[in-house]
Swiss-Prot record:
<dbReference type="InterPro" id="IPR005835">
    <property type="entry name" value="NTP_transferase_dom"/>
</dbReference>
<protein>
    <recommendedName>
        <fullName>Xanthan biosynthesis protein XanB</fullName>
        <ecNumber>5.3.1.8</ecNumber>
        <ecNumber>2.7.7.13</ecNumber>
    </recommendedName>
</protein>
<dbReference type="InterPro" id="IPR011051">
    <property type="entry name" value="RmlC_Cupin_sf"/>
</dbReference>
<dbReference type="GO" id="GO:0004476">
    <property type="term" value="F:mannose-6-phosphate isomerase activity"/>
</dbReference>
<dbReference type="InterPro" id="IPR029044">
    <property type="entry name" value="Nucleotide-diphossugar_trans"/>
</dbReference>
<dbReference type="GO" id="GO:0004475">
    <property type="term" value="F:mannose-1-phosphate guanylyltransferase (GTP) activity"/>
</dbReference>
<dbReference type="Pfam" id="PF22640">
    <property type="entry name" value="ManC_GMP_beta-helix"/>
</dbReference>
<keyword id="KW-0413">Isomerase</keyword>
<dbReference type="Pfam" id="PF00483">
    <property type="entry name" value="NTP_transferase"/>
</dbReference>
<keyword id="KW-0547">Nucleotide-binding</keyword>
<dbReference type="Pfam" id="PF01050">
    <property type="entry name" value="MannoseP_isomer"/>
</dbReference>
<dbReference type="InterPro" id="IPR006375">
    <property type="entry name" value="Man1P_GuaTrfase/Man6P_Isoase"/>
</dbReference>
<comment type="pathway">
    <text>Nucleotide-sugar biosynthesis; GDP-alpha-D-mannose biosynthesis; GDP-alpha-D-mannose from alpha-D-mannose 1-phosphate (GTP route): step 1/1.</text>
</comment>
<keyword id="KW-0448">Lipopolysaccharide biosynthesis</keyword>
<keyword id="KW-0548">Nucleotidyltransferase</keyword>
<dbReference type="InterPro" id="IPR049577">
    <property type="entry name" value="GMPP_N"/>
</dbReference>
<dbReference type="GO" id="GO:0005525">
    <property type="term" value="F:GTP binding"/>
</dbReference>
Length: 467
């Protein structure tokens, strides 16, 4: 295979799949279809055609999740580029292209959103092979999905005559239903997948031609970025100065070298709970589920949850259960969950952004109970991991070890605690928690005080650069 370098775009917030997908843990990090997360599945399907480990473009807040999920697959990415603020796909791909050419190479960039489902991986890989041949000739390739219905939620691409990689005649905005029906009947149009393949230098060349402001801002953001062992943090001010634009508007609609390669591979962008039903294994009545679910005399329903969900006599209904929220909606209106999230945000509620269980680079914590002046958390610390040296102005903490071994720094003391042992951290005392063992550390934390927010943390030292 050609010199293909996957660029995985992982900056989305995924609120259309609330309450499972939230800003703090969006859908690309969830195993919605199969055992792997969508980010992991994106790499696994591209690996057979890749000559390099991927470059991942992610939000600062999601950096550890992206790194850890690739690490679970035994993959060390070529780079993880951190956007200080989302500026759409054209700038994200620009900084990835600059990174790809950093050491003098000029690979073919296979640009992939991290949150798509593709059922037929062999067909996808065959399409990449066709696209690579065109990209080697200087073309900018987009993958067009053969439409199966008159969808009004996708943009369309009109292709020229021919087979394989054919010239793009035009890009079309999301049409109304009648127009979409005409597109489907004509056989000349494809859904715009948001996946691309081109030489890194060709993309940068066309971007400089058509959107020099984006190219200049991204050059400065990349050159001024700060690198450590795992991440490259783009220069905040320079990247923020870039116009926010998609690759479609910035380059693909303007270049004379755009071609489209058809892709018929069971593609879905999983943009709603209804579309997740479409890509899930269904019973004879069109029902699908994930978890412990009973669907009695139901048709075309979808359920997702960890606790037992029982549905009786329902049609076209979606039920999603999490620890702190339940969504119930009609399949035809489930996309309106975005309005629900907006209302929750407006009310100042944490459920819009945070799960009850919050993942950190050192492990996770689950807020299992909360009341006036107290909160109870179940904390899990990975083997060898260390939390920051910190203190709190407004709360004291009690720690009880459930399993594993805890090394506790409390002021000038260092304690070693094992199962069924506990300690007390007074308000205002510096403290730190470490798991020195080879097994996960599990403990119960009881907080008490006048204010229990996560922003009442003063960090003095931190392994993960959060001071």
């Amino acid at each position: 295979m050609s010199d293909v370098l996957p660029i995985i775009l992982s900056g989305g917030s995924g609120t259309r799949l609330w309450p499972l997908s939230r800003e703090s843990y969006p859908k690309q990090f969830l195993p919605l279809v199969g055992e792997h997360s969508m980010l992991q599945a994106t790499w696994l399907r591209s690996a057979p055609v890749a000559a390099h480990a991927p470059i991942v473009v992610a939000n600062e807040e999601h950096r550890f999740m992206a790194a850890e999920q690739l690490q679970q697959l035994g993959v060390k990415p070529s780079a993880i580029l951190l956007e200080p603020k989302g500026r759409n796909t054209a700038p994200a791909i620009a900084v990835a292209a600059l990174e790809a050419t950093r050491n003098g190479g000029d690979p073919l960039l296979l640009v992939l959103p991290s949150d798509h489902v593709i059922r037929d991986e062999a067909a996808f890989q065959a399409a990449v092979t066709v696209a690579a041949a065109a990209a080697e000739q200087g073309k900018l390739v987009t993958f067009g999905i053969k439409p199966t219905a008159p969808e009004t939620g996708y943009g369309y691409i009109k292709a020229g005559v021919g087979t394989g990689a054919t010239a793009v005649e035009r890009f079309v905005e999301k049409p109304d239903l009648a127009t979409a029906q005409g597109y489907l009947a004509s056989g000349e149009y494809y859904w715009n997948s948001g996946m691309f393949l081109f030489r890194a230098s060709r993309y940068l060349e066309e971007l400089r031609k058509f959107q020099p402001a984006i190219a200049d801002a991204c050059q400065k953001a990349w050159e001024g970025g700060k690198r450590d062992a795992d991440f490259t943090r783009l220069d905040k001010d320079a990247f923020a100065s870039s116009p926010s634009d998609s690759i479609d508007y910035a380059v693909m609609e303007k270049t004379a070298d755009a071609v489209v390669v058809p892709l018929d591979a069971g593609w879905n962008d999983v943009g709603s709970w209804s579309s997740l039903l479409d890509v899930s294994e269904q019973d004879g009545q069109g029902n699908a589920h994930h978890g412990d679910v009973i669907q009695l005399d139901c048709k075309n329903t979808y359920a997702y949850g960890s606790r037992l969900i029982a549905m009786v006599g329902l049609e076209n209904v979606v039920v999603v259960e999490t620890d702190d929220a339940v969504l119930v909606g009609h399949r035809d209106r489930i996309q309106e969950v975005k309005e629900v999230v907006s209302q929750i945000k407006s009310a100042g509620r944490s459920e819009a952004t945070w799960h009850r269980k919050v993942y950190r680079p050192w492990g996770a914590y689950d807020s299992i109970d909360m009341g006036q002046r107290f909160q109870v958390k179940r904390i899990t610390v990975k083997p060898g991991a260390t939390l920051s040296l910190q203190m709190h102005h407004h709360r004291a903490e009690h720690w009880i070890v459930v399993s594993g071994t805890a090394e506790v720094t409390r002021g000038e003391e260092v304690l070693l605690l094992t199962e069924n042992q506990s300690t007390y951290i007074p308000l205002g005392v510096t403290h730190r928690l470490k798991n020195p063992g080879k097994l996960p550390l599990e403990l119960i934390e009881v907080q008490s005080g006048s204010y229990l927010g996560e922003d009442d943390i003063v960090r003095f030292e931190d392994t993960y650069g959060r001071t």
